[in-house]
Amino acid sequence: MSERRNAWPPLVYEDLAPLVGYVNRLVQVAGKYTLDEPFEVGWGNVVLDVTPRGLKTPTLRQRGVTFSVHYRLLDGDVVIEADVGSRTVPLSKGSVATFYAAFCDAAAELGIHRPRTLLICEIPDCAPTFEDDHVERSWDPGAALLMWEALNLAADGLETWQAPFLGHRPRVGVMWGGFDLSATRHRVQPTEPPPARPTFMQNAQLEAYVAVGFSFGDATAPSIGMYAYIWPQPDGLEGRYWGVDGAVWNADAGLVLLPWDKLRKATDPHQAIVAFGDAVYDAAVELAGWPSDLIGPRVNGWYMSRTPPEAVRAQHH
C-alpha cells in the first residue's frame, strides 16, 4: 500500500458538510436510474462504486443505449459515458436545478431519457425536487479531495472485511440516498420491518442483515466515522468490546460508532476497520444466532491460485 493510501487525513464535519450536502443531492440525479434496474436485496442495485476519481453508477441499460454516470470528485465534473459517445457536465458554482437541467440536456444528446422522478430523498429540510433547489452552491476542490480520500480508504477496509463472507453480500459502495458507504451481509431470515418507516426502508429490512459502513454525519449527528448495526437488533449489545479502541455502542442511535479521529489514530486504520466489522459479526453470531461457518478464508487471489483445496480447508475451517 502506498504512502498516500496510508495517510488518513483529519476530517472536520463543519468543513465538509456544505460540499457533502451538495454532492448528496447531485448523485441522486443519476442515482434515480438505478431504480430502473432489478431490485437486489438490501438495495444492492442502487450502490455507487468508489472509483479512482469519484463515484460511479453501475452500467445501466435503456432501450437503445448502454451507459454509466461518473461523478468525478477529483476533476469537478460529471461524465456520462455511453456506447454512442460521452458528455461532460462541469461541477462549478451553481444550483442543483441548474445542474439537473444541464445533466438532462447532456443525457438527451446521447439518447438517454431523463430520470423518472425529480424527488430529492433522505435529506432533511431539502427542496422537494431537483428543479426546486435554487440554492447557489460552490464547488470546493479541497473538500472534494478529502471526501474522496475518506471514501476510498473506508471502502478499502470494508472490502477487505466483506470479502470472506460466503452468503449474499451486495458490493461495497455509496447508497446515494443517505450518502453513506455501506457493506452488508445478508441471511435468509424473514423479519418484520418497522411500520412507521418509509416503504423503501421497510423493504430493505425484509430479511436479517449485518451492516458496517462509513458516514460523513449530518446536522443531527455531526460526527464523521464508521458505524455498524445488526438487524433485527439483539439484546446484549451494551458493554461489548468492538475490536478497536474508541468504538462504542450508542443505544439512542441504535449504532456501534467508531469516530474517524479514533480510527485514524489506530496503529493500522485499515486493519482496524476489519477488526471493527469482525467484532460486529461476532456479536451477531453470539447474540442473534448468525452462523459462524459463513466466513471463509481472508486471503488474496495468489493464495487461492496456488494452495490446494484440502490445505485451504485444513487451515481455515
Predicted segments — roles?
Residues 1, 249-317:
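TerminUS-proximal long segments
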Residues 2-66:
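N-terminal ordered "arm"
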Residues 42, 196-198, 303-307:
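Intrinsically disordered, low-complexity linker/tail regions enriched in polar/charged residues
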Residues 48-126:
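Long, hydrophobic/aromatic-enriched structural stretches that serve as scaffold segments
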Residues 59-61, 237-243, 268-272:
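Short conserved micro-motifs at the rims of enzyme active sites and ligand-binding pockets
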Residues 65, 70, 98, 102, ...:
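Ser/Thr/Asn(+Pro)-rich, low-complexity disordered segments
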Residues 131-218:
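Aromatic/basic-lined ligand-recognition segments
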Residues 207-257:
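Low-complexity, glycine/alanine/valine/leucine- and proline-rich hydrophobic stretches
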